[in-house]
């Protein structure tokens, strides 16, 4: 756990990682102790983002991977908080010069499969990107939506 945050910290000035599970949060805190560019926050993303997002500006990238997928991943009030996460991002888009939203595990966004019933379908994500004037595509197992003034990047 924490590999994505560590990788992002190689390129970004600051990385905020939100971990709802207490044990995983504590492991991440230990792992990133002494790294001033990685901020580990304990809580549910849908509760943390409303106060965190207004503090950000400039070029902002979001890696959304807070869905419950079994194993040690956290199961919150919903298996997939992406609807609330995207609403929070949408409410703050005007603050950012450029934005990229990456949503992992796109294969799970099929609510007709019983174990993914809490997930929105792909059309929800596409409509959200279009409504917010973002270019979107799928690469590997990741839905990518970003400001139209950004070059295409390979994941």
Report residues per predicted region.
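Short amphipathic alpha-helices and their capping/turn segments at secondary-structure boundaries
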Residues: 43-56, 85-95
């Amino acid at each position: 756990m924490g590999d994505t945050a560590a990788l992002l910290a190689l390129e970004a000035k600051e990385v905020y990682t939100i971990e709802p599970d207490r044990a995983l949060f504590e492991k991440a805190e230990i792992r990133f102790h002494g790294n001033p560019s990685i901020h580990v926050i304990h809580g549910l993303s849908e509760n943390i983002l409303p106060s965190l997002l207004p503090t950000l500006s400039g070029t902002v990238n979001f890696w959304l991977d807070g869905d419950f997928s079994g194993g040690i991943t956290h199961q919150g009030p919903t298996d997939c908080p992406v609807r609330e996460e995207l609403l929070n991002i949408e409410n703050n888009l005007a603050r950012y010069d450029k934005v990229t939203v990456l949503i992992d595990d796109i294969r799970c966004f099929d609510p007709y499969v019983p174990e993914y019933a809490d997930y929105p379908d792909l059309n929800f994500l596409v409509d959200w990107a279009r409504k917010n004037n973002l270019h979107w595509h799928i690469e590997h197992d990741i839905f990518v939506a970003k400001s139209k003034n950004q070059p295409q990047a390979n994941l």
